Protein backbone atom coordinates (compact mmCIF):
# COMPACT_ATOMS: atom_id res chain seq x y z
CA UNK A 1 0.00 0.00 0.00
CA UNK A 2 2.79 2.44 0.88
CA UNK A 3 4.48 1.70 -2.44
CA UNK A 4 1.28 2.63 -4.30
CA UNK A 5 0.96 5.86 -2.34
CA UNK A 6 4.54 6.77 -3.21
CA UNK A 7 3.96 6.08 -6.91
CA UNK A 8 0.88 8.33 -6.92
CA UNK A 9 2.69 11.13 -5.08
CA UNK A 10 5.77 11.03 -7.31
CA UNK A 11 3.58 10.95 -10.45
CA UNK A 12 1.77 14.10 -9.31
CA UNK A 13 5.08 15.90 -8.82
CA UNK A 14 5.71 15.59 -12.57
CA UNK A 15 3.04 18.26 -13.12
CA UNK A 16 5.11 20.82 -11.20
CA UNK A 17 7.33 23.18 -13.21
CA UNK A 18 9.63 26.11 -12.44
CA UNK A 19 8.01 29.27 -11.16
CA UNK A 20 4.85 27.66 -9.84
CA UNK A 21 3.08 28.44 -6.60
CA UNK A 22 1.96 25.04 -5.35
CA UNK A 23 -0.41 23.86 -2.63
CA UNK A 24 1.14 21.14 -0.49
CA UNK A 25 -1.42 18.66 0.78
CA UNK A 26 -1.63 16.72 4.03
CA UNK A 27 -1.80 12.99 4.63
CA UNK A 28 -0.01 9.74 3.91
CA UNK A 29 -0.13 9.99 0.09
CA UNK A 30 0.43 13.75 -0.21
CA UNK A 31 3.49 13.20 2.01
CA UNK A 32 5.27 11.51 -0.90
CA UNK A 33 4.40 14.37 -3.25
CA UNK A 34 5.97 16.86 -0.83
CA UNK A 35 9.03 14.62 -0.43
CA UNK A 36 9.50 14.47 -4.21
CA UNK A 37 9.17 18.26 -4.54
CA UNK A 38 11.79 18.61 -1.81
CA UNK A 39 14.10 16.27 -3.70
CA UNK A 40 13.68 18.24 -6.92
CA UNK A 41 14.30 21.55 -5.14
CA UNK A 42 17.54 20.18 -3.71
CA UNK A 43 18.82 18.09 -6.62
CA UNK A 44 17.39 19.84 -9.68
CA UNK A 45 17.17 23.42 -8.45
CA UNK A 46 13.40 23.49 -8.95
CA UNK A 47 12.09 27.00 -8.23
CA UNK A 48 8.70 26.88 -6.52
CA UNK A 49 6.83 28.45 -3.64
CA UNK A 50 4.68 26.25 -1.43
CA UNK A 51 1.46 26.98 0.44
CA UNK A 52 0.76 24.38 3.11
CA UNK A 53 -2.46 22.84 4.36
CA UNK A 54 -1.40 21.94 7.91
CA UNK A 55 1.26 22.49 10.54
CA UNK A 56 2.50 18.95 9.83
CA UNK A 57 3.09 19.72 6.15
CA UNK A 58 4.69 23.07 7.02
CA UNK A 59 7.26 21.28 9.17
CA UNK A 60 7.92 18.70 6.46
CA UNK A 61 8.41 21.39 3.79
CA UNK A 62 10.71 23.45 6.00
CA UNK A 63 12.94 20.43 6.66
CA UNK A 64 13.10 19.76 2.91
CA UNK A 65 14.01 23.36 2.11
CA UNK A 66 10.86 24.18 0.12
CA UNK A 67 10.24 27.97 0.23
CA UNK A 68 6.84 28.75 1.75
CA UNK A 69 4.32 31.59 1.68
CA UNK A 70 1.19 32.20 3.71
CA UNK A 71 -2.16 31.78 1.96
CA UNK A 72 -2.76 35.46 2.82
CA UNK A 73 0.23 36.52 0.72
CA UNK A 74 -0.90 34.95 -2.56
CA UNK A 75 -3.79 35.62 -4.93
CA UNK A 76 -3.82 32.28 -6.73
CA UNK A 77 -2.17 28.86 -6.65
CA UNK A 78 -1.07 27.17 -9.87
CA UNK A 79 -1.40 23.59 -8.68
CA UNK A 80 -2.41 21.84 -5.45
CA UNK A 81 -1.82 18.16 -4.81
CA UNK A 82 -3.56 16.45 -1.92
CA UNK A 83 -4.87 13.07 -0.88
CA UNK A 84 -8.47 11.95 -0.44
CA UNK A 85 -10.15 9.41 1.81
CA UNK A 86 -12.86 8.49 -0.70
CA UNK A 87 -13.60 9.51 -4.31
CA UNK A 88 -16.84 8.62 -6.08
CA UNK A 89 -17.63 8.20 -9.78
CA UNK A 90 -18.78 11.83 -10.00
CA UNK A 91 -15.43 13.10 -8.68
CA UNK A 92 -16.86 14.17 -5.34
CA UNK A 93 -14.69 13.24 -2.39
CA UNK A 94 -14.36 12.96 1.35
CA UNK A 95 -11.26 14.47 2.92
CA UNK A 96 -10.21 15.23 6.47
CA UNK A 97 -8.92 11.96 7.83
CA UNK A 98 -5.81 13.89 8.79
CA UNK A 99 -7.89 16.61 10.52
CA UNK A 100 -6.75 19.31 8.07
CA UNK A 101 -9.96 19.70 6.04
CA UNK A 102 -10.50 23.41 6.72
CA UNK A 103 -7.03 24.49 5.64
CA UNK A 104 -7.14 22.01 2.74
CA UNK A 105 -10.36 23.55 1.42
CA UNK A 106 -9.05 27.10 1.89
CA UNK A 107 -5.95 26.24 -0.17
CA UNK A 108 -7.97 24.36 -2.80
CA UNK A 109 -10.32 27.29 -3.45
CA UNK A 110 -7.88 29.66 -5.26
CA UNK A 111 -6.16 26.76 -7.04
CA UNK A 112 -6.11 26.67 -10.85
CA UNK A 113 -5.50 22.92 -11.05
CA UNK A 114 -6.44 20.63 -8.17
CA UNK A 115 -5.12 17.06 -8.15
CA UNK A 116 -5.85 14.23 -5.74
CA UNK A 117 -3.44 11.33 -5.31
CA UNK A 118 -4.93 8.07 -4.06
CA UNK A 119 -4.48 4.33 -4.13
CA UNK A 120 -7.19 2.29 -5.84
CA UNK A 121 -8.92 1.39 -2.55
CA UNK A 122 -10.10 5.01 -2.22
CA UNK A 123 -12.23 4.84 -5.39
CA UNK A 124 -15.83 4.02 -4.39
CA UNK A 125 -19.31 3.84 -5.91
CA UNK A 126 -20.86 6.00 -3.18
CA UNK A 127 -19.31 8.18 -0.49
CA UNK A 128 -19.94 7.54 3.18
CA UNK A 129 -18.26 4.30 4.25
CA UNK A 130 -15.42 6.55 5.46
CA UNK A 131 -16.70 8.70 8.30
CA UNK A 132 -17.40 12.28 7.21
CA UNK A 133 -15.38 14.82 9.23
CA UNK A 134 -17.20 17.98 10.27
CA UNK A 135 -15.10 20.75 11.84
CA UNK A 136 -17.04 22.65 14.50
CA UNK A 137 -16.29 25.52 16.86
CA UNK A 138 -15.71 24.45 20.45
CA UNK A 139 -18.52 26.66 21.77
CA UNK A 140 -21.76 24.71 21.51
CA UNK A 141 -20.07 21.58 20.17
CA UNK A 142 -21.93 19.25 22.53
CA UNK A 143 -25.29 20.74 21.54
CA UNK A 144 -24.39 20.29 17.87
CA UNK A 145 -23.33 16.71 18.61
CA UNK A 146 -26.82 16.04 19.97
CA UNK A 147 -28.39 17.61 16.87
CA UNK A 148 -26.38 15.22 14.68
CA UNK A 149 -27.27 12.32 16.97
CA UNK A 150 -30.99 13.10 16.74
CA UNK A 151 -30.72 13.27 12.95
CA UNK A 152 -29.32 9.73 12.90
CA UNK A 153 -25.82 10.67 11.73
CA UNK A 154 -24.05 8.49 14.36
CA UNK A 155 -21.59 11.22 15.42
CA UNK A 156 -18.37 10.77 17.38
CA UNK A 157 -15.83 13.35 18.49
CA UNK A 158 -12.37 12.88 16.97
CA UNK A 159 -10.05 12.03 19.83
CA UNK A 160 -6.34 12.38 20.49
CA UNK A 161 -5.55 10.09 23.37
CA UNK A 162 -8.10 10.71 26.11
CA UNK A 163 -8.97 14.24 24.94
CA UNK A 164 -10.86 15.69 22.02
CA UNK A 165 -8.58 16.45 19.11
CA UNK A 166 -8.10 20.19 18.52
CA UNK A 167 -7.35 21.20 14.93
CA UNK A 168 -4.73 23.70 13.77
CA UNK A 169 -7.57 26.25 13.75
CA UNK A 170 -8.50 25.37 17.37
CA UNK A 171 -11.74 23.60 16.50
CA UNK A 172 -13.17 20.15 17.22
CA UNK A 173 -14.00 17.50 14.64
CA UNK A 174 -17.21 15.48 14.78
CA UNK A 175 -17.07 12.41 12.52
CA UNK A 176 -20.40 11.29 11.04
CA UNK A 177 -20.86 7.57 10.37
CA UNK A 178 -23.33 7.85 7.50
CA UNK A 179 -22.74 4.59 5.66
CA UNK A 180 -23.86 5.97 2.30
CA UNK A 181 -24.29 9.60 1.25
CA UNK A 182 -26.81 9.43 -1.60
CA UNK A 183 -26.54 13.11 -2.55
CA UNK A 184 -23.19 14.58 -1.43
CA UNK A 185 -23.96 18.01 -2.91
CA UNK A 186 -27.26 18.38 -1.07
CA UNK A 187 -25.78 17.08 2.19
CA UNK A 188 -22.85 19.48 1.82
CA UNK A 189 -25.28 22.39 1.46
CA UNK A 190 -27.15 21.19 4.55
CA UNK A 191 -23.96 21.22 6.61
CA UNK A 192 -22.93 24.60 5.14
CA UNK A 193 -26.12 26.06 6.57
CA UNK A 194 -25.69 24.54 10.03
CA UNK A 195 -24.68 27.12 12.66
CA UNK A 196 -21.54 26.05 14.48
CA UNK A 197 -20.15 24.08 11.54
CA UNK A 198 -16.95 25.71 10.31
CA UNK A 199 -16.33 23.32 7.41
CA UNK A 200 -16.98 19.73 6.35
CA UNK A 201 -15.03 17.09 4.52
CA UNK A 202 -17.20 16.91 1.40
CA UNK A 203 -15.17 18.29 -1.51
CA UNK A 204 -17.79 18.38 -4.25
CA UNK A 205 -16.98 19.35 -7.83
CA UNK A 206 -13.56 20.72 -6.89
CA UNK A 207 -10.98 18.28 -8.23
CA UNK A 208 -9.57 18.40 -11.78
CA UNK A 209 -7.53 15.19 -11.86
CA UNK A 210 -7.35 12.06 -9.72
CA UNK A 211 -4.12 10.07 -9.91
CA UNK A 212 -4.91 6.48 -8.95
CA UNK A 213 -2.14 3.99 -8.19
CA UNK A 214 -2.94 0.28 -8.28
CA UNK A 215 -1.00 -2.96 -8.66
CA UNK A 216 -1.57 -2.59 -12.42
CA UNK A 217 0.03 0.86 -12.62
CA UNK A 218 -0.99 4.51 -12.50
CA UNK A 219 -4.19 5.90 -14.02
CA UNK A 220 -4.92 9.62 -14.39
CA UNK A 221 -8.65 10.35 -14.30
CA UNK A 222 -9.88 13.70 -15.64
CA UNK A 223 -12.96 15.22 -14.04
CA UNK A 224 -15.41 16.25 -16.79
CA UNK A 225 -16.92 19.24 -15.02
CA UNK A 226 -14.36 20.29 -12.40
CA UNK A 227 -14.30 23.71 -10.77
Swiss-Prot record:
One of its GO terms (biological process) is pentose-phosphate shunt, non-oxidative branch. The keyword ATP-binding does not apply. The active site is at 104 (proton acceptor). Pfam families: Rib_5-P_isom_A. Its EC number is 5.3.1.6. It catalyses: aldehydo-D-ribose 5-phosphate = D-ribulose 5-phosphate. Keywords: Isomerase. The keyword Isomerase applies. Disulfide bonds: none annotated. GO terms for molecular function: ribose-5-phosphate isomerase activity. Pathway: Carbohydrate degradation; pentose phosphate pathway; D-ribose 5-phosphate from D-ribulose 5-phosphate (non-oxidative stage): step 1/1. Substrate binds at residues 26-29, 82-85, 95-98, 122. NCBIfam families: PRK00702.1, rpiA. Belongs to the ribose 5-phosphate isomerase family. Homodimer. Catalyzes the reversible conversion of ribose-5-phosphate to ribulose 5-phosphate. This is Ribose-5-phosphate isomerase A. The lineage of its organism: Bacteria, Bacillati, Bacillota, Bacilli, Lactobacillales. The gene is rpiA.
Amino acid sequence: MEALKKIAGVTAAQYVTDGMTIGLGTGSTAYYFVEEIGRRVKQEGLQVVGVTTSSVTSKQAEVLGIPLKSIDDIDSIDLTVDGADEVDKNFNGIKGGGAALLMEKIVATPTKEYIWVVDASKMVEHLGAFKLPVEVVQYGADRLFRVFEKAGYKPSFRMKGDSRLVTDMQNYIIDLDLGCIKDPVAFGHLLDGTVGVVEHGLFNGMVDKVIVASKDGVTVLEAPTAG
